[in-house]
Amino acid sequence: MTKNRILILCLLAGFGMVRRVQAQALDGQQREALIQRAAAFRKQENYGMAIQQLDSILSKNPADAGIILFRGDLQLQNREFKKAVASYQQLIKLNHELTIARINLSYALFMDHHPAKALVYAAEAYARNSSNTNATVNYFNALLWNSRTTDAARFLATVSKSLSPAQRLVLNARLYTTSGNYTKGLANYDSLVRAFPDKNYVKEYAEVLLGKKEIARSETIMKTHDTLFTASEYGAYSQKLRATRMQNAGAEFVLFSDVAKNTRLESSIWYQQGEGRRFRFRYSAGVSTITSAENTRTSAQFGHITVNERFGLAWSGQSDVHLQVIKPEGKDAFSGITGRQTIQYQPNDRRMIGLVYNSEILNYTARLLGSNVRSHNLGYVTHILLSGRTGIFSQGSAGVLTDQNQRYLFFGSLYHLLRTEPTVKVGLNFSALHFSNPAITAYFSPDRYLSTELFADYSTALPHLARHYFQLQAAGGAQQIERLAWEPAFRLQAELGYRSSHFETGLKYQTSNVASSAGTGYKFNWFTYRLLWKW
């Protein structure tokens, strides 16, 4: 009798559990209603509410693969890339729509600043289903995300016949643009939107033009095809357009000191016009005070005008005019106008050469600034990317000084980009410096100076978009002054900042014992604090 009671109680308990599960589970009609509500919210571009409807379904059935796929798409549209990554990874575990899941996971990883991982899943999707056009296009894009332009070109040549005319145009446009050949890239984009005025192609072309500072052309393209876009889609582009035209103003404060107890305090304010102009002006004014170990002090007031010139896609320039009123302690004040002119030719984003002329009043110490020694220099600057990740940078100049000295400078750098987002770059630098009169001791003027170093750069993902950013450069090597023994040399630069849509602030610290880094030849510490407002 007791056993029968126990059996009955167990059956009743089991029946109660089944009824509770059935009460919690959604029937087909309830599930479909939530899907329809999600679709309606999606049509209204209210992706957050759409995701909530799907989460209600998944709370009852976490393994509903179709709903997980739908939610992942909505998370991409809502720019919730980390959550989208988790959704697509869950789909792969459920063995559901593996090609689509890997394609979308690849894109989500790229948008979440993991291009190398994105390439892995893009390659898997293409390897498993090479006949899928979306997998083909996504794998090509992933190669470009990782700057593997040579591999991308080779891959495109093998699959070109399987693509539609529109796909061939857009992939060629992306390839040329990423490879630095912006002339052919823009030409392909132009042909694309003329022949196939799809809103995604138009938006991509317009954003590429913004990146090339062809702002008027970008705006014209979007206005010509504005009927293709919803109000919110066009508003998102308009926000990017406004950002390029923002003017800015700010203040900067500098503290510099070296081991010889030379100290410079400087504060300045500036105003700069927005981009999209053929001539973009920046005006600044400030004061500085330089104090030496023996308490010699020289103060200065200055005004500065910078003009960035655009003569076309390939030609650009920058003009600087600097007016100073300098007051040495115990002496009469004097004024001086100096400046800088740069002309730059860049027919390809991976190849640039420029000519530079500049003049300056040497201000390394209080006594030197008060002596009104001026320098006039003519030089070059060049930057060549040998591939998507390896490049050469070099600059050099020859100058004459009003104290009858002459200066010759060379700097060369070979670097390799290890990864992007965050950016990690390593390389080798070499520099040489020669003065014709090493007997002058008012500043560092060796007959022969050589320096070589290994360096590494790091910057957080997309520092121009992120709210918080951090950039670090460190280098170590050796230097030789005259014929003396080689000595250790190091360099460190770090910057921490915060950006919002209208405000920016940042603190930068630099230190180095590289003798040519400062005019005195001494180790120094240099702090710069900046505040900026954009509107």
Spans of features found by a protein language model:
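Short, conserved structural micro-motifs that define repeat-unit consensus positions
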Residues: 37, 70-73, 88, 143, ...
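Amphipathic alpha-helical repeat elements characteristic of tetratricopeptide repeat
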Residues: 28-32, 36, 48, 66, ...
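Gram-negative and organellar
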Residues: 30, 41, 103-107, 111, ...
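Short, compositionally biased segments
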Residues: 43, 77, 82, 111-113, ...
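N-terminal leader/linker segments that initiate helical-solenoid repeat arrays
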Residues: 21-66, 70
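Bacterial Sec-dependent N-terminal signal peptides
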Residues: 1-29
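Mid-chain, structured segments of secreted extracytoplasmic proteins
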Residues: 65-104
